[in-house]
């Protein structure tokens, strides 16, 4: 709201409806909204599957998800940076610079998330034990976090690619990738593994 900022918004300014801007907002924003809804509904479906396994498994799943979410922070940061830098570069008609920014953001995210993966692999049980003294829950949570640890570099790539695509105005692509990944791969695979194996909670995290 300060007039000295590069982009300032003042309350006394007159806001007039601009159809072109509104259409652009909807075109770019709607897929992002649907992407988040798709992922959230998928998480609900996975939690419902885990609930059917048992109480200890549900508690371990919840606590492991909490511990896991902390490790995503570096990738979220690099993803946001990629979106901003790619959009800025493309707007300046400098696609070569956009590619460089994309590569650096990808590299940084992979390095940080690999380090976070090591923390989850070797310290997963300790992280879960910070939330509960229950030995069974701690053991289950530590086991699934080891699985998650191996996927950390790939999550880093996925998250930064999403940021890059948003910066390049390709939000529909990120929505399709998220929808297919959740509802064509993850949910069906978890369902099949739960029905055909005795792996229990591990099924949801393998998927």
Predicted features and spans:
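Short alpha-helical transmembrane segments in multi-pass integral membrane proteins
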Residues: 1-29, 86-151, 194-207
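Hydrophobic faces of transmembrane alpha-helices in multi-pass small-molecule transporters and flippases
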Residues: 14-45, 70-74, 78, 145, ...
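Interfacial/gating helices of multi-pass transporter permease domains
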Residues: 21-28, 50-69, 136-142, 170, ...
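Structural signal for membrane-spanning alpha-helices in multi-pass inner-membrane proteins
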Residues: 28, 47, 73-76, 120, ...
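Helix-terminus/linker motif at the lipid-water interface of multi-pass membrane proteins
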Residues: 33, 37-70, 88, 126-135, ...
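Generic alpha-helical transmembrane segments of integral inner-membrane proteins
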Residues: 37, 41, 45, 110-122, ...
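Small-residue-rich hydrophobic transmembrane alpha-helices
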Residues: 61-124, 155-177
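C-terminal structured "cap/appendage" subdomains that terminate the fold
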Residues: 161-165, 172-203
């Amino acid at each position: 709201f300060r007039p000295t900022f590069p982009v300032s918004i003042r309350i006394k300014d007159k806001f007039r409806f601009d159809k072109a801007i509104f259409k652009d907002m909807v075109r770019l924003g709607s897929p992002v909204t649907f992407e988040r809804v798709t992922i959230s509904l998928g998480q609900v479906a996975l939690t419902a599957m885990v609930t059917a396994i048992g109480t200890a498994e549900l508690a371990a799943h919840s606590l492991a998800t909490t511990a896991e979410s902390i490790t995503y922070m570096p990738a979220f940061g690099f993803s946001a940076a990629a979106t901003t830098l790619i959009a800025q570069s493309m707007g300046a008609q400098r696609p070569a610079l956009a590619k460089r920014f994309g590569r650096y953001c990808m590299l940084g995210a992979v390095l940080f998330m690999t380090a976070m993966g090591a923390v989850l692999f070797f310290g997963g049980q300790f992280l879960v034990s910070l939330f509960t003294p229950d030995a069974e829950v701690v053991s289950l949570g530590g086991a699934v976090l080891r699985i998650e640890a191996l996927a950390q570099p790939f999550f880093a790539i996925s998250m930064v690619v999403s940021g890059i695509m948003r910066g390049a105005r390709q939000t529909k692509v990120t929505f399709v990738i998220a929808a297919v990944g959740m509802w064509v791969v993850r949910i069906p695979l978890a369902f099949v593994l739960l029905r055909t194996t005795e792996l229990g909670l591990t099924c949801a995290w393998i998927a």
